[in-house]
């Protein structure tokens, strides 16, 4: 009987303990565009719900992706009498904690909505993801996992592996971190409060490095030594892994040793002092079968707009022209000046209905009114079209040639024998025709910098030769006779020099 009662009491107590451990649910709203040199709230709205608590000791906001040390800062603004803030530049993390006692969730909501992001660079770039969580572990949205550095100077890799496996975080099972992306390098190494052991080893097979903890258990991430290769992802420091003295375990390098967040191989115990003495280990939480589904973290995003591509345009002569621009986020604003002013158009494709001269336009994707963001130039080029002309030619006699004159304001002048010909018969301003038997039309066109003029026709009139008949005229000596051309309405030139239709002569001879 006593055993039955004890069993019931035990079950009752277990049930009560589970109910008291309900985790809060966090939900942030915010996907915003940042204007350089400004301060922008990291969220547009924050929601915190908890079925059994009204407050908590502290909350943490970290720039978990895209963080730039020395430029990015999170600041609590406004008046919050129950909450104090502390910024850790190394981790890119702002801690909000109670002045005395636990602030309420409503007070934390107001504080989080008052946290602003600033960047000191003149031309910042990239995207920032902000992780808001109730625990000290770093949260990475892309994996949904948590990462926590545990200081423990001199701890061996084996003991660190066991300690990590014995750790839990809001019900999530811990393990030595398995780092499989650049983002994980940043959050678990570069932005961690210290460096230490991670879950990689080649103890089982020298030169074959595997993850031996967590969901990636058994996954090979490196083959070989210093000059090896990775089938997936690895982030060894320069000249690592070098296996100097049974170094079979992966460790994040100490600050100041090589590239931040990179790895080196150490023995199970490492060095007894200095940079290669283990100072702790990195525990990762998440991804283990049976882990609870939690909402103790939430994220928001701020993106710094960047013009990713512009397409200038060129046309010959006045007319409509279309320019293009794209950005990573936001709407494209078009301006006539590199700074200041108001947009003349918003959109990716900008058409100017009539443009007469080459004009520079400027684009950005910042919110309207953002005056400090860089604009990118897009040029609409109007290339001049040549203006051509010619001297009207005189009629020419049949079976003779003539010289034609033309001119152009720009470029090269080409002559064609038809309006649709593509191959010129002559290039230049003075063209001598071949002998012409019939009236002929030539065409001229100039081209300058790829821009052709309209083609102009130059008609050449060919006048048939007069049909002259030979004639013998008899007249008396010491008299004169008038020779008749027999053709009227023409110009005349006799062999005597006369220029009239008829010609008087007084001596025998041959006249033409």
Regions found by a protein language model. Give the residues of each.
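Extracellular glycosylation-rich, acidic/polar low-complexity regions of adhesion-
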Residues: 20-142, 255, 263-265, 285-307
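Short beta-strand/loop motifs in extracellular/secreted proteins, especially
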Residues: 52-59, 70-72, 196, 207, ...
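Proline- and Ser/Thr-rich low-complexity, intrinsically disordered segments
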Residues: 301-512
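Acidic Ser/Thr/Pro-rich low-complexity disordered segments
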Residues: 69-78, 215-220, 338-342, 419-426
């Amino acid at each position: 009987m006593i055993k039955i009662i004890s069993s019931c009491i035990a079950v009752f107590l277990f049930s009560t303990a589970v109910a008291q451990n309900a985790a809060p649910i966090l939900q942030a709203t915010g996907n915003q565009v940042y204007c350089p040199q400004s301060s922008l709230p990291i969220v547009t709205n924050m929601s915190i719900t908890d079925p059994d608590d009204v407050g908590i000791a502290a909350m943490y906001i970290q720039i978990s992706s895209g963080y730039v040390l020395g430029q990015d800062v999170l600041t609590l603004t406004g008046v919050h009498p129950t909450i104090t803030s502390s910024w850790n530049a190394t981790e890119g993390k702002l801690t909000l904690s109670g002045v005395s006692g636990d602030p309420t969730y409503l007070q934390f909501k107001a504080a989080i909505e008052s946290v602003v992001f600033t960047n000191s660079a003149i031309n910042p770039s990239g995207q920032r993801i902000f992780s808001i969580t109730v625990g000290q572990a770093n949260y990475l949205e892309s994996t949904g996992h948590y990462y926590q550095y545990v200081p423990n100077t001199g701890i061996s890799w084996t003991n660190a592996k066991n300690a990590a496996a014995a750790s839990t975080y809001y019900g999530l099972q811990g393990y030595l971190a398995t780092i499989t992306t650049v983002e994980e390098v940043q959050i678990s190494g570069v932005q961690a409060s210290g460096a230490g052991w991670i879950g990689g080893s080649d103890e089982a097979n020298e030169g074959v490095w595997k993850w031996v903890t967590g969901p990636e258990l058994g996954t090979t991430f490196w083959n070989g030594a210093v000059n090896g290769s990775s089938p997936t992802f690895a982030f060894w420091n320069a000249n690592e892994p070098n296996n100097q003295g049974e170094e079979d375990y992966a460790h994040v390098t100490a600050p100041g040793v090589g590239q931040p967040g990179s790895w080196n191989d150490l023995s199970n115990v490492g060095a007894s002092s200095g940079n290669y003495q283990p100072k702790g280990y990195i525990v990762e939480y998440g991804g283990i079968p049976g882990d609870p589904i939690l909402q103790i973290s939430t994220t928001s995003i701020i993106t710094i707009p960047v013009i990713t591509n512009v397409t200038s345009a060129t046309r010959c002569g006045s007319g409509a022209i279309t320019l293009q621009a794209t950005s990573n986020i936001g709407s494209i604003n078009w301006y006539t000046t590199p700074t200041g002013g108001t947009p003349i158009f918003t959109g990716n494709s900008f058409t100017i209905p009539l443009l007469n001269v080459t004009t520079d336009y400027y684009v950005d994707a910042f919110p309207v009114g953002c005056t400090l963001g860089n604009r990118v130039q897009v040029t609409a080029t109007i290339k001049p079209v040549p203006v051509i002309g010619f001297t009207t030619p005189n009629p020419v006699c049949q079976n003779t040639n003539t010289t034609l004159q033309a001119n152009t304001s720009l470029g090269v002048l080409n002559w064609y024998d038809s309006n649709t010909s593509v191959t010129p018969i002559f290039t230049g301003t003075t063209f001598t025709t071949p002998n012409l038997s019939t009236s002929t039309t030539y065409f001229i066109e100039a081209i300058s910098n790829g821009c052709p003029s309209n083609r102009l026709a130059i008609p050449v009139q060919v006048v048939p030769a007069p049909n002259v008949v030979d004639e013998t005229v008899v007249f008396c000596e010491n008299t004169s006779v008038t020779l008749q051309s027999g053709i009227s309405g023409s110009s005349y030139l006799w062999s005597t020099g006369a220029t009239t239709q008829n010609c008087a002569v007084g001596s025998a001879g041959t006249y033409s």
